[in-house]
A protein has these predicted regions:
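C-terminal soluble interaction/assembly domains
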Residues: 235-238, 244-298
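Short active-site oxyanion
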Residues: 34-40, 124-125, 248-249, 273
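Thiolate-centered catalytic microenvironments shared by cysteine-dependent enzyme domains
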Residues: 79-170, 195, 204, 258-275, ...
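N-terminal signal peptide c-region/cleavage motif recognized by signal peptidases
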Residues: 13-16
Length: 317
């Protein structure tokens, strides 16, 4: 009997250690589904969820984790997030595994943003299914169909921890003091001011920002996050060329989506403690009453020409 108790305790300890891994492969996740403290959070749309999902998964579409229509990157009200995590049956001791479609590297940003939100709400056992449902299906793992099995709501009353959040005022203060490095996770067309998000009022990047395109963290052509060695190589190259002083990092993008991937790489994979995300990102920055000039900001004539092209495309294409 004593041997059985010792073995059981050792198994529980091993699971606790394993559960903390930020990335899980389908093969790693599958045997963990039997654990009652694990909850798969599928953030795809309801139709995709019903066509096939992981056994026991709860559908909490990504749109439910977003802020107001004017800038979806803003962190939602705590009351809304509380209702969401309670309806998913989450508690502080739940091991939550966030799952998306896995169609491309951009899709990973949604899982990273939900992971960031759950961490900020107090969950400590968090993972992302690397490669999403695309890898789950391609490896032949079983799926259930239909709306899923209802779960009992929890009474979890979270508090939002701002440790990993940077606000607009905090970004302005960091610029004034030159105390942090702003890291733009967007591709070239946004960083160089050739294109802007629909809700952004100005194209370009935040003053002094350095670019670290979120795509660099992935196995090319997939939504699969690269291994730790490749992640460390990307981060080391960036640090040596763009952040030799080793300043704290504030990541941003358009609406706190791609920037969640950069945050995840530095904070969760590499273990840096001085990384925050500007959730409102470029849209919030450009919507302020008196935003400082952007870097790579197009001229007024270029902006007017861009607006005209966008209007034409919406009207006639």
């Amino acid at each position: 009997m004593k041997a059985i108790i010792v073995f059981t305790a050792a198994l529980a300890a091993a699971y606790a250690t394993w559960a903390a891994q930020p990335l899980l492969t389908p093969a790693q996740l599958q045997p963990m589904l039997r654990n009652p403290d694990l909850r798969v959070i599928d953030i795809r749309d309801p139709q995709s969820f019903e066509m096939g999902h992981i056994e026991g998964a709860v559908n909490a579409p990504y749109g439910q984790w977003l802020g107001p229509a004017g800038n979806i990157g803003i962190v939602p009200e705590l009351a809304a997030l509380t209702r969401l995590v309670q309806s998913a049956g989450l508690t502080p001791s739940t091991h939550a595994v966030v799952v998306s479609s896995g169609v491309d590297a951009g899709d990973f940003g949604a899982t990273a943003r939900v992971y960031w939100t759950l961490k900020s709400l107090g969950l400590t056992e968090l993972s992302i299914l690397n490669g999403g449902m695309m890898d789950w299906d391609s490896e032949g793992e079983m799926t259930d169909m239909g709306p899923g099995t209802p779960v009992a709501p929890s009474q979890f009353a979270p508090r939002f921890n701002p440790e990993w959040l940077a606000t607009r005022d905090e970004v302005k203060e960091s610029l004034r003091k030159n105390s942090a490095l702003l890291v733009d996770a967007r591709p070239d067309v946004f960083y160089l001011g050739k294109f802007r998000a629909p809700m952004a009022l100005v194209a370009g990047t935040l003053p002094g920002a350095k670019q670290l395109d979120f795509n660099q963290w992935f196995v090319p052509g997939t939504a699969r996050f690269a291994d730790v060695e490749k992640t460390r190589q990307v981060a080391t190259q960036f640090q040596s060329t763009q952040n030799p002083q080793g300043k704290p990092i504030i990541t941003f993008c358009n609406t706190g989506y791609w920037s969640a991937t950069d945050w995840f790489a530095f904070s969760e994979i590499l273990g840096r403690k001085d990384v925050r995300m500007y959730a409102g990102s470029a849209v919030d920055w450009t919507q302020s009453k008196e935003p400082p000039p952007m870097d790579n900001q197009p001229s007024r004539a270029e902006s007017l020409a861009y607006d005209a092209r966008q209007w034409w495309n919406r009207k006639f294409k």
